[in-house]
């Protein structure tokens, strides 16, 4: 049973050798293997974004930097690997093998059904186009005013996620750039088809890191239950197949928790520094990693930190700061538009970090210490109050809030069509945040959500009552992000888009809380007269936690959004040729120019721009003349757009037909929707100009 150590640290049972002789004959490969894979992931992200920011991205530059960083970090993990490689008992070895099998199966299955999000409509297309830019141009400053589009009069270059800060200046890609740099590495190695499968690999690594930390928090079998439940969750499956950065964030975060717990157990400051690198890299991966970091910094400073954690916390904070330096350069130098869009998010966070520092400084004064001691005398009533608040607030959020509140915010979102389709009153300022707890229930199942709520409350109670700072980073991150995103997800509320808010921290964190409670209750029931019915009930709950997500995931097992688009873009590039320049028309009733200008520019490596339909023939001919040794093509969806234009015969560049998961607001997405995309091209030639007059 978990117990409090002399320092008040909550401890759990560790896998033990099956016999004394086993230790001499059989060293565990689990910990070294996990370390190797996670070190490769961390250093891949850091090397990729560093080389991209330097403007020299290519395999020839990324691989040596990646290798050097990986070797350095691998050497730094040697004490942790040596201390944690004792052989485990047979059942634990089987469970660990199963955890590896789950991770590998996730890579293989989700890699077989990649979502080819290559149009710049939403974040996935921006990420893949940024990766294409890196492959074709080698840097993050995107010079678009090149011949024949160096005279920008009447021309536009921006797209969803791509913006300029000054006229005729470079385009900046939104978001943090570690994830697209990792996709670009894959694309350089194996092409566009492999690029869109990168997240399947990152999803497998995330599952492995999640299990590894879960094994330390709960029993191995319970961690495996949580891993299976996560792997089968539709939110995890969907975003493992789609090119979004949440999976990278999830893997780095739980790798950091895992490494930090080893550092605490082994009193190892070097391992703590490496753990900090992982935790800080959540900001390298995503801007909202800053919220996670705020919770972790809070956990690593007084009054929360104490005992063994206090000895390694400075090293962990130093490691996190190292990663944050890289992230801050990426954010402020290479994503200035992203900063402008999120000032209202960044300023409160900055104030939060300052307040955390001031609180820590105040606690270390004599009056601060006295105040902490006075509060700690009531830690058990405080723990009881916190646990009760979690349960009551959770029930309220799930049962009551959706019935009594309609949440709105100051801006409007393009959701009116969806509201009409679902028979709702059109109100495009609705956030649907009042339903956010039920969103979790859709994908996790109510049994998992109920057990997770109780486990969350139980873990908080034990950690506060026993002053168990060992789990404070995990609990504060899970608690803070869950409360934040249940209260206000701050995202366009269509599904499954909005549900990615819960993926890096909330869903996995709650599943581990459920795993901890299952393991604890199982051991409490062992040896009691009523252990058979108790174990039977727990077995049923365990089965429901694993299997209920299949109600959502099962019918969509072979979901593959936008299938074939990668190959069709490669064919389009071949049809246009390396000596092409393309000008896309902004046609009424279509967004093809908005969705395809940057993807074609990035993946074909040719100059691209778009323009309004009012562009004159004289301007078209002038652009064709400026093209010099390139052929200027006018691109449109409607053949009528070429009438009266100085162009030759048009031909099909791209004809794409595929499916997407439906968008919903008040019900979970279950159906598939068909869509099509046609791109026609015609060469601009003076001989084809209509007669004057």
PLM regions and their residue ranges:
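Membrane-embedded, hydrophobic transmembrane alpha-helices
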Residues: 1-97, 306-455, 621-624, 647-651, ...
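Membrane-interface alpha helices of multi-pass inner-membrane proteins
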Residues: 52, 213, 226-227, 271-286, ...
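Transmembrane-helix motifs of polytopic, lipid-linked glycan transferases
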Residues: 70-79, 194-217, 255
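Transmembrane alpha-helical segments
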Residues: 104-112, 289, 487-488, 517, ...
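Transmembrane-helix signature of polytopic, membrane-embedded enzymes
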Residues: 193-194, 210-232, 251, 264-274, ...
């Amino acid at each position: 049973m978990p117990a409090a150590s002399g320092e008040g640290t909550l401890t759990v049972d560790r896998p033990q050798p099956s016999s004394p002789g086993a230790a001499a004959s059989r060293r565990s490969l689990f910990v070294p293997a996990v370390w190797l894979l996670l070190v490769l992931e961390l250093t891949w992200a850091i090397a990729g974004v560093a080389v991209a920011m330097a403007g020299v991205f290519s395999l020839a530059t990324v691989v040596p930097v990646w290798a050097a960083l990986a070797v350095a970090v691998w050497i730094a993990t040697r004490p942790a690997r040596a201390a944690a490689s004792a052989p485990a008992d047979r059942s634990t070895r089987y469970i660990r093998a199963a955890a590896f099998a789950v991770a590998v199966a996730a890579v293989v299955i989700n890699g077989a059904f990649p979502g080819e999000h290559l149009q710049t409509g939403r974040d996935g297309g921006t990420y893949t186009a940024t990766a294409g830019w890196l492959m074709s141009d080698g840097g993050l400053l995107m010079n678009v005013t090149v011949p024949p589009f160096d005279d920008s009069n009447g021309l536009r270059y921006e797209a969803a996620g791509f913006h300029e800060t000054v006229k005729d200046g470079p385009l900046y890609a939104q978001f943090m750039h570690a994830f697209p740099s990792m996709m670009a590495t894959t694309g350089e190695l194996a092409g566009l088809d492999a690029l869109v499968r990168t997240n399947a690999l990152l999803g497998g690594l995330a599952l492995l890191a999640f299990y590894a930390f879960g094994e330390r928090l709960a029993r191995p079998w319970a961690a495996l239950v949580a891993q299976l439940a996560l792997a089968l969750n539709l939110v995890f499956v969907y975003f493992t197949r789609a090119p979004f950065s949440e999976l990278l964030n999830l893997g780095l975060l739980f790798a950091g928790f895992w490494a930090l717990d080893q550092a605490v157990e082994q009193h190892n400051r070097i391992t703590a520094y490496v753990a900090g690198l992982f935790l800080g890299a959540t900001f390298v991966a995503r801007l909202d990693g800053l919220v996670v970091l705020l919770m972790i910094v809070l956990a690593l400073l007084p009054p929360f930190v104490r005992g063994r954690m206090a000895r390694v916390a400075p090293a962990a904070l130093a490691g996190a700061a190292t990663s944050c330096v890289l992230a801050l350069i990426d954010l402020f130098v290479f994503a200035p538009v992203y900063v402008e869009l999120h000032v209202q998010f960044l300023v409160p966070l900055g104030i939060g970090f300052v307040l955390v520092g001031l609180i820590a400084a105040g606690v270390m004064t004599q009056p601060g210490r006295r105040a902490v001691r006075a509060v700690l005398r009531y830690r058990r009533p405080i723990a009881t109050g916190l646990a009760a608040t979690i349960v009551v607030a959770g029930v309220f959020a799930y049962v009551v809030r959706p019935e009594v509140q309609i949440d709105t915010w100051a801006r409007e979102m393009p959701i009116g069509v969806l509201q009409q389709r679902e028979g709702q009153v059109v109100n495009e300022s609705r956030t649907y945040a009042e339903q956010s707890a039920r969103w979790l229930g859709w994908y996790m199942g109510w049994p998992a959500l109920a057990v997770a709520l109780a486990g969350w409350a139980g873990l908080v109670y034990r950690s506060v009552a026993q002053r168990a700072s060992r789990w404070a980073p995990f609990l504060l991150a899970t608690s803070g992000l869950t409360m934040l995103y249940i209260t206000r997800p701050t995202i366009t509320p269509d599904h499954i888009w909005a549900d990615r808010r819960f993926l890096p921290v909330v869903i996995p964190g709650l599943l581990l809380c459920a795993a901890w409670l299952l393991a604890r209750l199982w051991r409490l029931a062992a040896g009691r007269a009523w252990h058979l019915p108790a174990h039977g009930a727990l077995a049923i709950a365990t089965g429901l936690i694993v299997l209920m997500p299949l109600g959502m995931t099962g019918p969509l097992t072979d979901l593959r959004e936008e299938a074939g688009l990668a190959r069709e873009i490669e064919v389009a590039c071949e049809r246009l040729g390396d000596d092409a320049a393309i000008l896309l028309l902004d046609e009424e009733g279509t967004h093809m120019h908005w969705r395809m200008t940057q993807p074609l520019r990035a993946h074909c490596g040719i100059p691209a721009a778009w323009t309004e339909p009012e562009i004159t023939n004289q301007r078209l001919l002038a652009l064709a003349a400026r093209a010099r040794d390139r052929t200027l093509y006018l691109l449109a969806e409607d053949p009528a757009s070429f009438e009266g234009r100085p162009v030759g015969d048009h031909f099909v560049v791209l004809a794409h037909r595929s499916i997407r998961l439906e968008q919903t607001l008040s019900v979970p997405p279950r159906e598939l929707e068909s869509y099509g995309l046609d791109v026609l091209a015609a060469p601009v030639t003076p001989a084809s100009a209509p007669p004057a007059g």
